[in-house]
Structures are given as C-alpha cells and as structure tokens.
C-alpha cells in the first residue's frame, strides 16, 4: 500500500471536512452500539473497533474518530492488500470522516490505478445516487460525490458501491485511448441524469456493466457452481418457475395488486390446475404499511424461497422487471441452461448486454401484460427440443460474457459518454445501441 503509507508518513490531519447537522437514524446508532459491544455475532474484532469510531461520527466527534482510525490503519496497513474485510471496514470509516486522500490512495493501491485518484465532495445538486467523474489532460482522475451523502448515515452504501465499480473505472483509466472531460455516473437502479448508467431506455444514457456483475467478476461463483452441478435437460421439470421480491412499486403501497410481479403471481395462480407454474413472492420489500403486508401475506401468493442453485431444476425460468431490469437474475437464469421466458419491459428498459440477446433464439419473449404467458409455456412443453435449444443458446451467450470481455467492451461506451458531454453532435452510439422508439 505504497500511496497509503506515504500519506500516513506525512501525518497531516484533514483541513476541509464538511460538517452537517447529524441525522443518523436511531436504528443505525443502535446497530453501531451492538457491533462495538460484540452483541452481534459474525463480525471481526476490526469491525467492532471501527464501529466504536463510527459512533463518534454519529455524535459529530469527527476529529477523535479520525485520530483513532488512523491508528488502526497504521497497525493494519501491511495486511490491507490481503484482507478484504479489514479493507472495506476502514475504507467506509475513512470515507465517513472525510479522509478522502486516504480513500483515494487505498483505491489506487488496491486496483493498480495508473494515476492519482482524487475523491471529493461538492454541492453538485445531482443527488446521492450519482457522482461526477473528471479526467484531466494530464491523466488525473477526480470523483466527486454530492455533499448530500454526508447528511445522514448512508455513507457506507455510497463508498461500497463506488468500491464495487472501481475495477471498471480502473480498467478504463489504463487505456491509452481514454478520453478527457467530465461525465456523470448513475449508480441507482435507473438513470437519473444523462451519463453512464446500469439500466435505462434513453439515448443519452450510456450503459455499462453494473455493480453486481463487476465485483463478482461476471458472477464467476455462479458459473463455477452451475458448471459442476449441471442438470440434464431430461431431468428438469416442465414447469415455468419464478421467485422474487415485491420490487417495482410505482405508486401507493395500497395499489400493490397493480405491481407487475404480483400480476405474474396471480396469472400463475389462475392456471395452477395446469401444473405448469411454480411462481410466487419470496420476500416483501419496499412495503412498510402493516395492513398491506398482512394483505399480501394472506393472499396466497407468498411461497418459500428457492436457492438460485436450484433454478436449473425447471425447464422454463420467468424473468421480469422489478424497480428496473432484473440485473443478476437474467444472467444467472441464462447460465442454468433453462429456457428463459423474459417478460418484455413495459418501460423498454435495457442493460448493456441486451443487444446481444435475440428473441426466440436466446430467450422466449413474453408480452408486457403477460397475456401470452400460458400459451407460450404450453407451446414449449409441446416443442421440448426447441425449448432445450433456446436454453443452450442462452447459456452460450451468458458464458461468453466474461468479466474480461465486458470490461473491454465498456471502453468505447465510456469514451462515447465523455465525447457526448463534450459535443453531443459528435457522438456515435457504440455496438448497436440505438435510441428507444418509446
């Protein structure tokens, strides 16, 4: 950790910390107290120590927290490259006390970033789910978070998301053709402002691999598990399967029956006597109204969880949007070799790899209102060899999406985004991405 050690040797405290009225929730404070006291099992001693200093942050005692964290960092600096748990704990805590010079140095050292990494806060007015990425003519990289992330206790999610994205950013920074300029990086489920994004449907949102695909190295663990435990096609059940949470709420929680995922479950229940569906809600999220929770639990639509490793027991896997595109669910479903039945997005949402997918070849398209779901499942049952081939094609396209290939494919996309925000008229959309007609 060369650059970290250099900063520690200088032993200079931060001088530009922004202090806001503390709005840490009671739940977060209690969690920190229990972590620090060792009441919560499964955490390391370093987590307990760091939690003690984060408690000081919650009380506004940033300088005392910083001093303690620097002592911890000095003691553990030599093991940081090897111990991801210690690294993440300290990265989060240093971000919270705004030792951004050390945050940048830790990221540079861990990922071999080719130049200085400057992390900053600014009143950008862009919201917590975005950050601004600037590349100067001399190769300096500056990542600016909106100061709103400092006003409550959500800093852990912000720095973790940034950390998970960093291999992609470091890969681009190492390219000789890397552009200069500024671009916004959307880090929410759907893009908020034109720039780089994980999921959207507008032409000025440039799609890149998401913060699930990148840190998992293209879901490497899923690939390995499924490769070792591949289920022969003839041993799979001729049933359309889905499990998922109640994401995708667009209006009042009282209107939960209008949720697309709820409608899917109700359609499946209507045809349950056919024996063709195993579909249900496996978790309630984004629902805080106790009456709505009770209604859903009493609806008969909530079924037990099924581990993703067992999805391959079914010949047909339904894929449906939640808050946005299904992210890991689609790729993992394709990797099983089962035939994916993809409910077309009612909002025309897409991810970076959607241009690779051909309907009726890699997946079976289902209408957004799912009016054709039963007929298509029945058709697949009658045309078993075709269904098997769709599953094989889907697995092949997913297996080809290695982390190495997708990082490299992201390079022209990121370059296009930088060029677009310099001069929108000079930009050409990369590898076939075209503006949505919707």
Language-model segments: residues:
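C-terminal extracytoplasmic interaction modules
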Residues: 438
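Catalytic binding pocket for nucleotide-activated donors in carbohydrate/polymer assembly enzymes
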Residues: 305-435
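Residue-level marker of positions within ordered structural domains that often coincide
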Residues: 1, 58, 245, 269, ...
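A ubiquitous short alpha-helical element
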Residues: 37-39, 361
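Secretory-pathway glycan-assembly enzymes, especially type II membrane glycosyltransferases
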Residues: 11-17, 21-28, 34, 41-47, ...
């Amino acid at each position: 950790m060369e650059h970290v050690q250099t900063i520690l040797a200088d032993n200079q405290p931060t001088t530009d910390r922004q202090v806001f009225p503390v709005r840490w929730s009671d739940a977060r404070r209690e969690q920190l107290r229990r972590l620090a006291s060792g009441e919560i099992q499964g955490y390391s001693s370093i987590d307990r120590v760091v939690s003690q200093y984060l408690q000081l942050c919650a009380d506004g005692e940033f300088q005392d927290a910083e001093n303690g964290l620097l002592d911890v960092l000095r003691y553990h600096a030599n093991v940081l490259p090897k111990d991801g748990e210690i690294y993440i704990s300290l990265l989060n805590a240093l971000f919270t006390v705004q030792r951004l010079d050390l945050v940048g140095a830790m990221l540079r050292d861990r990922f071999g970033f080719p130049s200085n990494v400057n992390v900053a806060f600014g009143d950008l007015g862009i919201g917590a789910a975005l950050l601004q990425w600037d590349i100067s003519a001399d190769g300096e990289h500056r990542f600016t978070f909106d100061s709103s992330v400092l006003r409550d206790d959500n800093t852990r999610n912000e720095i973790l998301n940034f950390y998970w994205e960093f291999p992609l950013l470091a890969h681009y920074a190492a390219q000789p053709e890397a552009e200069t300029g500024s671009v916004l990086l959307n880090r929410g489920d759907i893009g908020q402002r034109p720039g780089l994004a994980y999921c959207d449907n507008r032409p000025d949102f440039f799609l890149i691999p998401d913060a699930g695909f990148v840190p998992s190295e293209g879901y490497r663990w899923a690939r390995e598990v499924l490769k070792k435990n591949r289920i022969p096609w003839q041993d799979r059940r001729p049933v359309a399967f889905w499990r998922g949470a109640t994401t995708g709420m667009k209006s009042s929680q009282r209107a939960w029956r209008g949720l697309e995922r709820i409608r899917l479950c109700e359609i499946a229940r209507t045809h349950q006597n056919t024996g063709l569906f195993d579909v249900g809600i496996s978790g309630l999220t984004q629902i805080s109204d106790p009456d709505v929770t009770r209604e859903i639990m009493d609806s008969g639509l909530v079924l037990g969880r099924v581990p993703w490793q067992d999805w391959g027991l079914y010949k047909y896997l339904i894929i449906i949007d939640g808050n946005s595109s299904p992210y890991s669910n689609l790729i993992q479903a394709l990797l099983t070799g089962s035939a994916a039945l993809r409910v077309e997005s009612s909002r025309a949402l897409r991810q970076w790899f959607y241009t690779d997918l051909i309907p009726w070849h890699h997946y079976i398209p289902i209408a957004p209102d799912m009016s054709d779901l039963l007929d298509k499942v029945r058709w697949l049952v009658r045309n078993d060899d075709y269904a098997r081939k769709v599953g094989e094609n889907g697995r092949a396209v997913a297996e080809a999406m290695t982390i190495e290939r997708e990082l490299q494919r992201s390079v022209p996309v990121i370059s296009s985004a930088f060029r677009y925000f310099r001069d929108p008229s000079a930009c050409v959309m990369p590898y076939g991405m075209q503006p949505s007609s919707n």
